[in-house]
Swiss-Prot record:
Changing residue 38 to D: In t1639; at the permissive temperature of 15 degrees Celsius, progeny of X-ray-irradiated adults die at the embryonic stage in a unc-32 mutant background. Phosphorylated by vrk-1. Phosphorylation by vrk-1 in mitosis is essential to achieve correct timing of recruitment of nuclear envelope components during nuclear envelope assembly. Dephosphorylated by protein phosphatase 2A (PP2A) following interaction with lem-4l during mitotic exit, leading to mitotic nuclear envelope reassembly. The keyword Phosphoprotein applies. Interacts with emr-1 and lem-2. Interacts with lem-4l, leading to decreased phosphorylation by VRK1 and promoting dephosphorylation by protein phosphatase 2A (PP2A). This is Barrier-to-autointegration factor 1. The gene is baf-1. Belongs to the BAF family. The lineage of its organism: Eukaryota, Metazoa, Ecdysozoa, Nematoda, Chromadorea.
């Protein structure tokens, strides 16, 4: 699977205090919607990923319902967080 530069940059280092828009698949529009819903930082969205027990289908559905994220972008975000978890947890 080919990944974007944004994906590689995110998974290549600790998350720290990065904005939610640093996650691959989450651009400015989705970032604003997520921020409005209380998910302004990457670690907050990562927390939701963990609360949903790293379940791909649940996380994608949640992103679609919460911020109107398309299935493709939601899968990209899931893959980004999932790979980060594999490397740092």
């Amino acid at each position: 699977m080919s990944t974007s530069v944004k994906h590689r940059e995110f998974v290549g280092e600790p998350m720290g205090d990065k904005e939610v828009t640093c996650i691959a698949g989450i651009g400015p529009t989705y970032g604003t919607k997520l921020t409005d819903a209380g998910f302004d930082k990457a670690y907050v969205l990562f927390g939701q990923y963990l609360l949903l027990k790293k379940d791909e289908d649940l996380f994608i559905e949640w992103l679609k319902e919460t911020a109107g994220v398309t299935a493709n972008h939601a899968k990209t975000a899931f893959n980004c967080l999932n790979e980060w978890a594999d490397q740092f947890m």
